[in-house]
Structures are given as C-alpha cells and as structure tokens.
Amino acid sequence: MTTQLDALRNMTVVVADTGDIDAIKKYQPQDATTNPSLILSASSLPQYAPLIDEAIAYAKAKSADKTQQLIDAEDKLAVNIGLEILKIVPGRISTEVDARLSYDTQATVEKARKLIALYNEAGISNDRILIKIASTWQGIRAAEILEKEGINCNLTLLFSKAQARACAEAGVYLISPFVGRILDWYKANSDKKEYAPAEDPGVISVTKIYNYYKQYGYNTVVMGASFRNVGEITELAGCDRLTIAPALLKELQENSTALVRKLAFKGEVKAKPQPLTESQFYWQHNSDPMAVEKLADGIRKFAIDQEKLEKMLLEKF
C-alpha cells in the first residue's frame, strides 16, 4: 500500500519543518528546516540539554564579554542542533539568521558567514547548509552577496510575487513561500472562513510563483512552507520541495488515497524581464496589504522567540 507521503516523495522533495530529532528519524525527510521558534521548542527537549551546555561552554571560552557570550551561545546552539539533524538527513539543514537583522544587509552577511564557519569547523561542507534569511529587500541583497561566495540561501517569510521575483533575480538558491499564514490573513480579514484546497489563497500564491519561475527559466528552488492542513500539501504536489511539520507528515503517512500531481510546468521558457529596482520592489510588495502585514508579523514573532531563547540561555549561564 502506497501512502500519500510515499507518493509525494515521488514528485516532490519532502523536507521536515522541525528541530525534533525523533520526528526526523521517523519520517526520513531529505532535508530539514529550522527557525528561531523551532530552535526554542527543541531546546526544551531533554535530549538537547547537552547541546545547550556545550554551546554555553563554547561561548564562555571564546569571550569574557557577557553580551558576546550570549550571541555566541545562540549561534552555536543553532548549529549544534543542525549538526545533530545532519547525522540523520542525507541533504541539507536550513539555519536561520537572527530575525532582528532582517533590515541590515551587512549584519546579515556577517552572521551568515559566522554560522557557515561554525558548520565548517565541525566538518560540514557548504553544500549541506542553507542560510535562512527573511525576504526583505535588505535580506535579498545579503543573499545575493552570499550566493556569490558559495553560501546557498533559503529566503523565508515570502508572501508576495515581488519578493519571489526579487529573490530569483538575485540568484537565490531557494525560497520558502508561505501557505498557511496567507490563509490565516484572508480568514481574519474577510467574511470567508472556509476554503477548499484549490481555492486556498496560500496555495494559489505558491502555484503562481512556481509557474512564474518555470515560465522564465529561473533556477531558484520553490519550497512551499507553513501548512495548516494536508489539503494544502496535496494541492501543491509536484512543487520542487515542500517543508512539512511532523503532525502533517503523520497524516500523509496514514493516508493511502491516491495523490495526483498538481504542479508541472508545460510550455516554452520566455526571456527573463529586467530585474526589479528597489523602488519597484517596494511599490509592488506594498501594494499587497497581506504581504506587508505577514512579513512584518513573521519577523516580529521570530524576534520574540529569539529573545525567549536568549532568556532561557541566560538562566543557564
């Protein structure tokens, strides 16, 4: 009996959206993605206690300055969790830059280089790592610099076509357009509270981005993210990659209903348009109130969880 998860693997690279090692072992994804919220959640698991202790010891040995120690411990913990995950997945781990740097190109570049250096010191090559960066104009510019240095990036919190287009034009390795958070916004801001999967505004957004990339021959990988239900996932079967939380991986594994491929580009590849300028990017992105609100909200939420993680680490120093 073929499960929907097995069927999905035949048309899409399945990625686990979690820092939980036990869940990753169970569902055997190709890659895994983490973010500050997932790192915070994983840090409460007992098996991660030694990783926290090691990160703090590393930070204390590296600097006598308390502020710097905290920064170093955060970075080392994120990498330590990534290293554990890389023992299980055959592909890549996505590790996220501090969301509070989302509007600072140079600081984002420097943080990414530091995270990569920590992985390299542990014997992990660049081709097993993706640096996650919020899809702000400044974040996209940082990714453009990093890609030229051989550091592949995963541009996250992506809600608008302008963000997707700017990422492709910058030569970004991979984007994570969000599905569920778009649905959340439309439910909260319209009278319609229920959507069939094919009418889900998040599904429609990712489908349009996928088709746009294929239509113009962009190599940037499209990895749908942030799912609220299995219907959103099955409606995007055929997308380059999908990053899925363990609870939804479980549902897919327990369902044997036939899965039909929904995304597959057929047609001629067109000449690429001129890249967006900064002013064009902001005009187009800001024309979409959902994208503006959800990008800002996502950055805020990740920053809050980063601060909670810092508080937890400080208590252990």
Swiss-Prot record:
Highest taxon of the lineage: Bacteria
Cited PROSITE patterns: TRANSALDOLASE_1, TRANSALDOLASE_2
Signal peptide: none
Gene Ontology terms: cellular component: cytosol
Pathway annotation: Carbohydrate degradation; pentose phosphate pathway; D-glyceraldehyde 3-phosphate and beta-D-fructose 6-phosphate from D-ribose 5-phosphate and D-xylulose 5-phosphate (non-oxidative stage): step 2/3
A GO biological-process term: pentose-phosphate shunt
Chain segments annotated as transmembrane: none
Subcellular location: Cytoplasm
Keywords from the named record: Cytoplasm, Pentose shunt, Schiff base, Transferase
Chemical reaction(s) catalysed: D-sedoheptulose 7-phosphate + D-glyceraldehyde 3-phosphate = D-erythrose 4-phosphate + beta-D-fructose 6-phosphate
A GO molecular-function annotation: transaldolase activity
Active-site residues per Swiss-Prot or TrEMBL entry: 132 (schiff-base intermediate with substrate)
Pfam families given in the database record: TAL_FSA (PF00923)
Family membership: Belongs to the transaldolase family. Type 1 subfamily.
Function: Transaldolase is important for the balance of metabolites in the pentose-phosphate pathway.
Subunit description: Homodimer.
Protein name as it appears in the record: Transaldolase
Gene: tal
